[in-house]
Curated annotation (Swiss-Prot):
Protein name per UniProt: Probable dipeptidyl-aminopeptidase B
Gene that this polypeptide is encoded by: DAPB
InterPro entries per UniProt: AB_hydrolase_fold, Pept_S9_AS, Peptidase_S9_cat, Peptidase_S9B_N, Serine_Prot_S9B/DPPIV
Ranges that cross the membrane: 95-115
Catalytic site: S760 (charge relay system), D837 (charge relay system), H870 (charge relay system)
Catalytic reactions on record: Release of an N-terminal dipeptide, Xaa-Yaa-|-Zaa-, from a polypeptide, preferentially when Yaa is Pro, provided Zaa is neither Pro nor hydroxyproline
Chain positions carrying an annotated carbohydrate: N121, N207, N303, N355, N814, N819, N822, N888
Gene Ontology BP terms: proteolysis
Length: 909
């Protein structure tokens, strides 16, 4: 359940965020909601590209796999609504009852038809225009005009996604900075080439231009090979190419790997003796003469001067992983598929040994799909495919990890014992940073993530020691999260750096800031930044020639992002020139930090440009993307106006964004939807340009949509964030309820029509808020893929915030969704979940349903999506999720839930 800047869409911020990909379109609708969902679906053809189901291709199946059925359970007892005084009375009562039902539904249908056919309104102002201070109203209400309403398909299908270019920075063979790796488009020019950033369009002759692959295909033994991914060697003489990719988990995959020689334009298998062996990871040596790779969970090395491959490990298998992470480390620690690190001189390979022997398995059932190549046994075709995952839940045994080393020259593996490290069963290795001269930095935490230790290991001497140790619980009662941005700074006496060092983020006076540690063994850093603001995923780039560090921070406000620079001695802190004061920027630097791809992401229409860094005298600028099409689109449709403010709850200022419908009229009463995520350290209220489901609800359904980043969320200081420790859901739900009560007092809000929804952690927060509120403030809620009991979620994420269940039994009880009586006080709520969710297991929803059944709670609906994982997209499910939300918000918006609340649960399986 990693959160951070990679998350762009609020509803797609899962406990592990669903990947931001385009989802399948939908061509069928739930029979229970057909009267509403098809009105929207029939009038707007989707533009979403297709997307395969998670790691599974459909096996033999009939039309049932393409449809979803909502089974209306009609197990009502007759004496609940029919007097038992004779058949004629029963018949008469039935007639009256169904006439009333027909009148209600007919009246609703007329009102709804009027609503969906009424003309939209156009706003001529940007949906994110105006001042962007976090305090008070900052955007102008929409100006009355005639314009189009945003179709649901467009809002969720990527039509409004800004065009964005990805730059693959690469270092030249002689250390040249500002080079790009480019692929030709449309078959013009060489397929793969290196280009100077100043000649990005390839229109000029440039000494730094290098053709790596002339064609997009090559042949090996008459087999036609079309590479899907490529990684040039550091000397740019060989290209590592991958074909036949198969997705595994979120970040991991396997494929066939090839070595392509740039000079001869020929290729060979990475392992000539096993050309069809599926490789899980391959990494170049910094000296370009070898490739380390993992296959079948064992680590190998291929020296380019030889066609033979040497096995570094041989006992890898089901429970032992070498050089790659297991599921929980991939998901919660590294956020990637790599656990192999070369030393900077190429003499050593550091790799993680992961032992899952004691980790319990969790079964994931697939009813309609199975992995490619899977064939069931004869006469077992009707049984589900069951995938067993080693998944450590809170309190269960974790995988044990150890850092191993391989001496390339001596061809031997070894380990280094370091005194005072944590015990195997209480250790997470969260970051490994290779340095020079055989030095390696290793960061480890205890499994509850409040003890942090940094070790320096010398592979040459085969010794190491702990150089830093912090108890975060004693500092502020909080936790530490895995870092992926710690940067090694090599010694350079001529540049004023007599010793090696590294830049890290640390807690300083209640905020996250940059610190420079030098020499490596020095536990006391030079603070590069200070103040009541925070750095974000820093540093972003380091110019070693000029001793300048670049980073992104919240110095202007917690909901803004700007690019800053500071000297390594802590002087000359300054914002990038010509930046808008209130804006949201991101940046990608070349390896030498001489050039940057600057990305303006809001609040106005996003743009991108390539520029030289302030420490580079080149003074280069190239507009890469202006999103003119998106700007034109925003002028053709009615978009809500955004109003940023803060609300004080218990002395804490909570960031808020309110989306008001076009032609907003303060004399009218509007229904309100609260949308939330709320996970620890996350942020949903920010200045990014974003058109999504929330935009659609405000623009086309006439709702006010409010998002509040309550306590526990990020970038407002440690006190704001860490207060939720040991008691997830308590303060967060309280903040949402208090904010909703404040909105209910506004003259333009109809407090009898207030709803709340969220996905993943947001689903948990939705249910926890409804449970705590017990119908007092919110009438309706929608929870997608929710956690309902933190004992069921993975250990690394959960214990970071909750400790182990053995050490916090009361906290786990309080954080579970268990008060079915309180939930029954709400008018109605909806739960949706994918049956094959490998992240937030379907077990969470099933156990909640059992609690509701035990107490006879009826005021909810349920939709299960077969074979969908946490992103819910198998067989068009993603669109169905939003159609169900649309259906129910339309009901609430027209006041029909007061009647609908008496219906028994609608469960869609």
């Amino acid at each position: 359940m990693r959160v951070g800047s990679r998350i762009n869409d609020e509803e797609a911020m899962p406990l592990t965020a669903p990947e931001s990909r385009a989802r399948d379109s939908i061509d069928s609708s739930s029979t229970a909601s057909i009267s509403l969902t098809l009105v929207e679906g029939a009038s707007h053809a989707t533009t979403e590209p297709s997307k395969p189901a998670h790691n599974h291709n459909g096996r033999a199946q009939g039309n049932y796999a393409e449809k979803y059925r909502d089974d209306l359970e009609e197990d009502w007892e007759e004496d609940n609504y029919i007097p038992s005084n004779g058949k004629s009375n029963q018949r008469r009562t039935l007639i009256v009852f169904w006439l009333l039902v027909a009148l209600c539904v007919g009246g609703w249908a007329v009102a709804f038809l009027f609503f969906v056919t009424s003309p939209g309104n156009k706003t001529s102002t940007s949906p994110h225009s105006g001042s962007n201070s976090p305090e008070g109203d900052v955007t102008k209400p929409g100006i009355p005009a005639t314009g189009k309403k945003i179709p649901l398909d467009d809002a969720i299908g990527g039509v409004w996604s800004p065009a964005e270019h990805t730059i693959s920075w690469i270092t030249g063979a002689k250390g040249e900075d500002g080079l790009l790796l480019q692929k030709s488009e449309g078959g013009t020019g060489p397929y793969l080439h290196v280009e100077d950033v100043r000649n990005i369009h390839g229109t000029q002759s440039n000494n730094n231009s290098i053709v790596l692959m002339k064609e997009s295909v090559f042949f090996v033994n008459d087999e036609r090979i079309s590479p899907e991914k490529v990684w040039p060697s550091p000397d740019l003489k060989t290209v590592l190419a991958m074909t036949r990719e198969k997705k595994n988990w979120r970040h991991s995959f396997t494929g066939l790997y090839w070595l392509f020689d740039v000079e001869t334009q020929t290729a060979q298998p990475l392992d000539p003796d096993a050309p069809n062996g599926r490789i899980q990871l391959a990494t170049w040596s910094p000296t370009s003469d070898a490739v380390a790779f993992t296959r079948d969970n064992n680590l190998y090395i291929r020296n380019l001067t030889s066609k033979s491959v040497k096995a570094i490990t041989t006992d890898g298998g089901t429970n032992l992983f070498y050089g790659i992470p297991d599921w929980v480390y991939e998901e919660e620690v590294f956020e990637g598929n790599c656990a192999t690190w070369w030393s900077l001189d190429g003499k050593y390979i550091s790799y993680l040994r992961t032992n899952e022997t004691l980790v319990p398995e969790f079964p994931i059932d697939f009813y309609l799909s199975s992995p490619p190549g899977y064939s069931p046994k004869p006469n077992e075709e009707s049984y589900p495919y069951v995938q067993q995952i080693k998944y450590p839940k809170a309190g269960a045994p974790n995988p044990t990890v150890n850092l191993q080393f391989y001496d390339v020259e001596r061809e031997e593996s070894f380990s280094v014992d370091v005194k005072d490290t944590l015990k195997d069963d209480d250790r997470l290795i969260v970051e490994v940073i290779p340095g020079s001269k055989g030095k390696v930095l290793v960061r480890e935490t205890n499994r509850e993530s409040y003890i942090v230790k940094v070790a320096v290991i010398d592979a040459n001497k085969r010794e190491g020691k702990i150089v830093r140790s912090d108890n975060i619980d004693e500092i502020d009662g909080g936790w530490v999260e895995p870092s992926h941005t710690t940067t090694y700074i090599p010694a350079d006496p001529s540049a004023g750096r007599p010793d090696d060092g590294y830049i890290d983020t640390v807690i300083h006076e209640g905020y996250i800031h940059l610190a420079y540690f030098t020499p490596l063994e020095n536990p006391k850093p030079k603070m590069l930044t200070t103040g009541k603001w925070e750095v974000v995923a820093a540093p972003s780039g380091v110019d070693l020639k000029n001793n300048v560090v670049y980073f992104v921070a919240t110095k202007e406000s917690p909901i803004d992002r700007h690019v800053y620079s500071v000297k390594l001695d802590g002087s000359e802190l300054q914002m990038l020139k010509d930046s808008d004061k209130s804006a949201y920027y991101d940046v990608s630097f070349s390896h030498g930090a001489g050039y940057m791809l600057l990305k303006y992401q809001g609040p106005q229409i996003p743009w991108q440009k390539l520029i030289s860094s302030p420490s580079n005298a080149d003074n280069y600028i190239e507009i890469l993307e202006e999103n003119k099409k998106l700007a034109k689109l925003s002028n053709e449709f009615s978009l809500p106006s955004l109003h940023y403010s803060t609300i004080n709850v218990d002395g804490f200022e909570l960031p808020v964004v309110e989306r008001r419908p076009p032609n907003f009229d303060e004399t009218k009463k509007y229904p309100v939807l609260f949308q939330l995520y709320g996970g620890p350290g996350s942020q949903t209220v920010n200045k990014k340009f974003l058109v999504n489901f929330q935009t659609y609800v405000a623009s086309s359904l006439g709702y006010i949509v409010v998002t509040v980043d309550g306590r526990g969320t990020g970038f407002n200081g440690r006190k704001f964030k860490c207060i939720v420790r040991r008691n997830l859901g308590h303060y967060e739900s309280h903040d949402q309820i208090q904010a909703a009560k404040a909105w209910g007092k506004k003259p333009y809000v109809d407090k009898t029509r207030m709803a709340i929804w969220g996905w993943s952690y947001g689903g948990f927060m939705t249910l926890k808020t409804l449970e705590q509120d017990a119908g007092e403030t919110f009438q309706y809620g929608m929870a997608v893929a929710p956690v309902t009991n933190w004992r069921y979620y993975d250990s690394v994420y959960t214990e970071r915030y909750m400790h182990m269940p053995q050490n916090n039994e009361g906290g786990y009880e309080n954080a579970s969704i268990s008060n079915a009586t309180n939930l029954s006080q709400n008018t109605r709520f909806l739960i949706m979940h994918g049956s094959a969710d490998d992240n937030v297991h379907f077990q969470n929803t099933l156990t909640l349903l059992d609690k509701l059944d035990i107490l006879g709670v009826h005021n909810y609906d349920m939709h299960v999506f077969p074979d969908s994982n946490h992103g819910i997209y198998f067989h068009h499910a993603y669109k169905m999720v939003h159609q169900r939300k649309y259906f129910n918000l339309s009901f609430l918006g027209h006041g029909f839930f007061s009647f609908y609340s008496n219906f028994l649960p609608i469960r869609s399986f």
